[in-house]
Amino acid sequence: MSSEEFFQAHPVFTHDEYAQSRESASPRTVDSLLRKHVASGRVARVRRGLYVAPTTGASAETVDPFLVATKAAPDAAVSHHAALQFHGRAYSVWSQVTFLTTHATRGFRFGPVEYVPVRPPEQVAQLPDMGGGVECVPSGGGIVRVSTCERAMVDVLHSPMLGGGWEEIFRSLSMVEFFDLDAVITYTLALDSAVTAARVGYFLSSHRERLFVEEAHLARLAKHAPKQARYLDTARAPGRLVHPWNLIVPEWVLDERWEEVT
């Protein structure tokens, strides 16, 4: 395979992937070739060890950002709000892409997009696919590793700041027509967080008809809800105590009156 054939098949690639394609070439030769292609403009360096090869005539910054995130670490998977955006289920389009990884790596910016690594919850970090709910989807000429809508739902409720806050979260999740509820509940319980179980249970109970939520689904989550009243989030905004979740939920969230929030 020639370098050009490799670039056409790999719009985003790592140094190691290119080195493997050069077979018997020495490390020095590989580095020299990459420098040559960067200098010619055929390849652009994203950061150390990570490159993009845009299609002819296109800007390097037009390469699929979800592919870039996938290649940012060996186990990287697009996550949280970015995963919902990938699936076309985000209320707002962001120029930030979060990705799960167990590797120590720094965030970076390439073009207009900020890439933010996120450590998976410690309860699932060492499990296969960091707890599951990660799929591989063709996109932008490559394969994107990305959280399913089910995992993304639970993750943004577990870490609402990574979902953009309650309005963005609820509006985005309301764009999802169907959830595998057993997958949602299984992953939720794996996180071993009473508050997260309550948040997920509250959301499902609030949309039970649309999402075909059965009492048995809610009962599984209710068993793990907090024993004492807890606020919906750390802002401790006043609201109404909602049973059986023992969550104090602000009125504007209860009624989903987003336009009234300033």
Please place each PLM-identified region on the residue numbering.
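Short beta-edge/loop segments at beta->alpha junctions of small alpha/beta modules
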Residues: 1-76, 177-205, 258-261
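Residue-level preference for alpha-helix termini and adjacent loops
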Residues: 12, 50, 77, 107, ...
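Short gly/ser-rich loop at a beta-strand->alpha-helix junction or flexible surface loop bordering the NTP-binding
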Residues: 15-16, 31-128, 244-247
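Residue-level marker of positions within ordered structural domains that often coincide
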Residues: 23, 88-89, 158, 205
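Short amphipathic alpha-helical segments with coiled-coil-like heptad repeat character
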Residues: 26-28, 91-93, 161-165
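Hydrophobic alpha-helical interaction segments
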Residues: 133-262
